[in-house]
Amino acid sequence: MYYEFLRFPGGKPKAVTLSYDDGCRDDIKFSETINRYGLKGTFNINSGFIAKAQNERCLTAEEMKKYIIDTGNEIAVHGELHRAPGKQRPIEGIKDVLNCRIKLEQLFGTIIRGMAYPDSGIHDFQNNANYECVREYLKDLGIAYARSLCGDNDGFKLPADWYNWIPTAHHNNKNIFAYIDKFNNRVLTDDTYISNREPWLFYLWGHSFEFRHADNWDHLEEICQKLSGKY
């Protein structure tokens, strides 16, 4: 698929998005941090693990609304029970995705068409599952895209296959700041050679709890500063 004439909202040739998984309590600090720099992201939620009351790991639906949705971020499907579609029988995979989408839409009153594959995603297949089958039932369930877990693409192009969307980089990628510099330094004008006019997307992914485990929230701060230009 060729995107030479595609532009992001406002006619912009470049955009930044963040995709973070599991709906854990660290998402509150993560959301507050990225919002401070004017960045937005997608929080991929397991509907079966939404907390009914405050606990140490998961957010409640009320907290998701307050700290994610009401601050201009969005939520997406991450499976009801965090099971890899590639390891489930198709009927189980369908149920896991559908139940998650229905529950999230009921809780938050919005249409949800995005997804990030949970666990090993489509990296490994068992129980008669295969990628073509997974892709087709996601389409039938109204899912418009699915972020993959097959590694980083180390680039900024939009996907050729929206159901195997490989992001630019995990936040712990050793080249993360070199990628940010390359992205920031790219200039696209009317004089840019026609084959180089495709839009660029910086697509960062991970889990917010990783910053707590590594005690490196300052790493997120530096990423946000460089991507936003706000210090």
Label each region the model flagged:
Residues 1-74, 81-86, 90, 102-122, ...:
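Active-site beta->alpha N-cap acidic-glycine motif
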Residues 38, 138-146, 223-231:
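Structural alpha-beta junctions
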Residues 60-66, 183-192:
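Histidine/acidic residue-rich metal-binding segments in metalloenzymes
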Residues 74-78, 146-148:
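Non-cysteine beta-strand/loop elements that form the S-adenosyl-L-methionine
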Residues 84-187, 219:
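Catalytic domains of cell-wall/extracellular-matrix polysaccharide-remodeling enzymes
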Residues 167, 205-221, 228:
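C-terminal active-site rim and adjoining tail of enzyme catalytic domains
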Residues 194-198, 211:
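C-terminal anion-handling pockets and recognition modules
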Residues 198-205:
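Active-site regions of oxyanion-processing enzymes, predominantly non-cytosolic
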